[in-house]
A protein has these predicted regions:
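Sec-dependent N-terminal signal peptides
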Residues: 4-15
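Intrinsically disordered, low-complexity, compositionally biased regions/tails
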Residues: 19, 140-142
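Predominantly extracellular/luminal regions of secreted and cell-surface proteins
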Residues: 19-40
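Acidic, Ser/Thr/Pro-rich low-complexity intrinsically disordered segments
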Residues: 24, 48-137, 144-146
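Extracellular/mature segments of secreted proteins
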Residues: 38-42, 124-126
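N-terminal first-folded block
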Residues: 44-46
Length: 146
């Protein structure tokens, strides 16, 4: 009987991990499909806790190498169970180059295109509005060569 309970617990835990992985892959596939007629290159999966009041919102940071004279598309999707809306920002050092949320207008966009002018390391930051908790995925896609 004890062995049966242990085996049942192991299968239950393994099954929940498989379902979670399946949800992330479905969200990634859906987000990549929403990017349009582009070539998928990379995904950025995030799960962030809620931020503290008055503090900086939790942010995931990813470094990537982009090539000169290439147009990239950066897309963002939030999981349905997320409290917050995901925002993707692209930086070169401290310079904001693109964002899926325009603070001045309060408008969200599902993606933005970036025309890379120089080969180098860039950083993708993903956070959730108002520091809320959430899960999401960012997608980097190839659009065309200039």
């Amino acid at each position: 009987m004890k062995r049966f309970i242990i085996i049942f617990a192991v299968f239950t835990f393994a099954g929940s991990a498989f379902i979670k992985a399946q949800d992330v892959s479905q969200l990634t596939a859906q987000c990549a499909a929403n990017a349009g007629d582009v070539m998928y290159l990379k995904d950025f999966v995030v799960k962030l806790d809620q931020g503290t009041p008055g503090g900086a919102p939790p942010t995931a940071r990813f470094a990537l190498l982009l090539s000169k004279n290439v147009v990239y598309r950066f897309s963002i999707c939030s999981a349905p169970n997320s409290d917050g809306e995901a925002v993707l920002q692209l930086f070169d050092m401290n310079t904001l180059l693109g964002s899926t949320f325009i603070t001045a207008t309060g408008k969200d966009y599902p993606f933005f295109d970036f025309k890379c002018q120089k080969t180098g390391v860039y950083h993708v930051f993903i956070s959730f509005k108002e520091g809320k908790a959430g899960e999401g995925v960012g997608i980097m896609s190839y659009v065309k060569k200039l």
